Amino acid sequence: NQDFFIKMKPFENTKEGAGIVEKMIADVLADNHQFKYVVIGMESTGFYGVHLANYLSTSELLAPFSVRVYCLNPKEVKNYKKSFNDIGKNDGIDSFVIADFARVGRIAIKPWRGSQYLALQRLTRHRMHITECITREKTYMLNNIYLKFSEYALLRNGEHPFSNKYGATAEAILTEFTTNEDIVNSSIEELVEFINSKSKGRIADPEETAKIVQAAARNSYRLDKCLYEPLTISIASSFNCISSFEKELKAIDKA
């Protein structure tokens, strides 16, 4: 029978449990001066292993032994385990396999650098989350725009009156005119003045833009009047959400 320096026992995945593991390793090192450095291998388990890996890799007790923590791909460990004949499966055996995997130098990845890695990972994933929120909100809003202003929603890029479909002028057209009839009943001069005001004079041909918007309003499906206000409120709310998400995106990019 082979003797082990650490007797196998379970511990909770908590700060207290991590402290127990740290002390077990530190006690072995204190009693066995032949060990010059420590390699800790653990299967990568997503969030569940993050705190333990961080704790051990930054341990002051283990620091004098150049502790290196490796979060291993479970598939690699599983494949390595196949090299053992008639070996069972339990936590003790799996721990032995991981330790042997490290002992024979099979680890090819970089040691865990939790703080730097986790910071970048969280920021990158949150940025993706915000981007997906913007995309999802725009898709949701387009459904409401189609219900309220069907022809406007169907205009393609080459036909669309605004270069930015989600800009201030587009938002004003969709939220400040409650019904399509309000646009149809406005004169071209009134629409030109409105467009110039909302775009701050940045639209090259406001009269042509006004004509396109009015034609789209004229050709759109008509709804019962009771539907226009809820749709307008929903569209305005979506614009507010998109604006907030875009502000958050800028803040993340500056981080």
Predicted segments, located by residue:
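A detector of single, family-specific signature residues
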Residues: 1-255
